[in-house]
């Protein structure tokens, strides 16, 4: 069992005070990082569940609910995990190979494994450096990070901290010029693709947040909009506009970067996205945070892969917690998978090194699952590897 530190209210309060101070004081931040590493060095963090257990003791309860929660009854949130249990693996035997290669490309960019970092808002809730620490950890793992519009570190700061490739996830706003300006900034900062989130015509009803009256702490902000704080009578300034298929046409006039659409759960929408010239589709239900009772991401993957038929790359996020989960998604046609909540857990436990370790755990588990199933290259993984029960 993972050692339980900081479980008392006083301990959690002191931990939060240290983290807030580290956010404001660069000199104290170095001390904070060193002490965090010492606290975790003797813990046996073997899997992502271990990280989840420890992270909960280090994140303020309302923030934890924001990170972990889903919409309404959280049916889809739970289904994202349980759906993987209905898929079993069909291992092959006596395969003669001694090396296992996990390297691949995503939209032509080399990465060390088909496991990426999903866009997620407000990462300073878990660590003073937030998204910058995540970018550092992803770079250590030689994989790609997707940075959120709602980051608590600016997209430029994230790019400066990153040693690996970046994509930028975009929400569109009522003020389209603001959206266009953010896209241009991402392009100038070296981001390699734009990920349009298309499943938020309005925010899902997240009851945990409502009960907690959750809001971003006063010492944090939407770092990509430092000079655009709306006046009280401009409440719609930052509200997402309802995207339509014409939105993709507009976005293509703003940037020459490849565009992916995130939030697709049906073959019909995948085909419409293809007609609009997208370079990739991310099969996702927003981590179970939007429409409750929607399909689990892994349940939607097959029909989208079949509809696309190789005409663009298909990715998946939602519920990935084990290397076997990633292997099942790859077998069903995903180019790569993305991790969301586990990145927060790694951040809370040990900053960029925690993120790196979370990704390395997933790498080791995926490699183990591939070898035990008789596959030593991503190229040999196909649908014959899985069976629904």
Question: Where is each model-derived feature located?
Answer:
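Short beta->alpha linker loops
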Residues: 71-72, 149-153, 174, 265, ...
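Alpha/beta enzyme core
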Residues: 122, 135-136, 140, 157-161, ...
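Short, charged beta->alpha transition segments
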Residues: 17, 99-108, 144-158
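Short catalytic-loop micro-motif centered on adjacent basic/acidic residues
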Residues: 67, 145-147, 167-170, 259-261, ...
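Glycine-rich active-site/cofactor-binding loop and its immediate structural neighborhood
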Residues: 111-155
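Alpha/beta catalytic cores of nucleotide-metabolism and tRNA/nucleoside-modifying enzymes
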Residues: 43-85, 296-389
């Amino acid at each position: 069992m993972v050692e339980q530190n900081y479980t008392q209210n006083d301990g959690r309060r002191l931990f939060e005070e240290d983290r807030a101070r580290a956010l404001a004081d660069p000199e104290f931040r170095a001390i904070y990082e060193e002490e965090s590493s010492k606290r975790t060095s003797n813990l046996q963090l073997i899997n992502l569940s271990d990280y989840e257990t420890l992270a909960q003791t280090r994140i303020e309860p309302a923030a934890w609910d924001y990170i972990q929660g889903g919409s309404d009854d959280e049916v889809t949130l739970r289904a994202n995990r349980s759906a993987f249990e209905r898929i079993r693996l069909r291992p092959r035997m006596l395969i003669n190979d001694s090396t296992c290669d996990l390297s691949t490309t995503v939209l032509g960019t080399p990465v060390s494994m088909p496991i990426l970092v999903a866009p997620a808002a407000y990462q300073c809730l878990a660590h003073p450096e937030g998204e910058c620490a995540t970018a550092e950890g992803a770079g250590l793992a030689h994989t790609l990070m997707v940075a959120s519009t709602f980051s608590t570190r600016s997209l430029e700061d994230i790019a400066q901290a990153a040693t690996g490739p970046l994509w930028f996830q975009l929400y569109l706003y009522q003020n389209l010029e603001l959206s266009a300006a953010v896209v241009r900034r991402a392009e100038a900062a070296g981001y390699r693709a734009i990920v349009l989130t298309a499943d938020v015509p309005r925010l899902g009803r997240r009851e945990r947040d409502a009960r907690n009256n959750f809001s971003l702490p006063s010492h944090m902000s939407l770092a990509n909009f430092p000079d655009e704080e709306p006046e009280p009578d401009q409440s719609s300034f930052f509200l997402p506009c309802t995207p339509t298929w014409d939105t993709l046409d507009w976005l293509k006039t703003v940037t020459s970067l490849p565009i992916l659409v995130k939030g697709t759960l049906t073959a019909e929408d995948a085909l419409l996205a293809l007609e609009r010239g997208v370079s990739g589709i991310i099969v996702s239900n927003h981590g179970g945070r939007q429409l409750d009772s929607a399909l689990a991401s892994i349940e939607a993957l097959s029909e989208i892969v079949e509809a696309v038929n190789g005409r663009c790359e298909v990715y998946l996020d939602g519920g990935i917690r084990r290397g076997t989960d990633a292997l099942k998604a790859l077998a069903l046609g995903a180019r790569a998978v993305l991790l969301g909540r586990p990145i927060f857990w790694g951040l809370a436990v040990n900053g960029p090194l925690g993120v790196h370790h979370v990704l390395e755990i997933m790498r080791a588990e995926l490699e183990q699952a591939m070898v035990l199933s008789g596959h030593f290259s991503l190229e040999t993984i196909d649908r014959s590897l899985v069976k629904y029960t």
